[in-house]
Amino acid sequence: MRRIEAIGESPVFLRHIHAIEVAEVSREFCRHGLSHALDVARIAWILVLERERPLSKDVVYAAALLHDLGRSEQYATGEDHDVAGARIAAEVIDGLPERLRFEADERAMIIAAVAGHRGACDADVVAEGRQEMLIDLIKESDNRSRACYACSARAACYWSDERKNLNLSI
């Protein structure tokens, strides 16, 4: 998984992760730093294996690691983090050494997952294509990564109870 290591070492990735972690240092609610990105990646990969989905580990991990990078821009400028995140994800992916670059279809899937990870998702429905499958997988894993059931800020959270992860499950 040298490509994933290269993403984690990318100056662009590190700059945005650092900016998120600084911006959220006093945040009462869920955070979006490296620990969250890794949680999403690991949960997503477990779901791929359990459901026997035709997605590569590199693509799943890349989408998960990059999915919230746009938060840095959202905090700085107010830009929607999905929009900013897609742009930042492209910058990270395109900055990889030539031998580690993703194929065009993989690149498109990763960027679509970053841009669409907050959209509609029904975990019980098998997405038609690999791109839709990845988008739904990242959204589901993002939600499952949240320990709302044990959160001290749960009552003050703007998420509806339907959206909150109220059970320890995986």
Label for each model-derived stretch:
Residues 1-170:
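Metal-dependent phosphohydrolase cores
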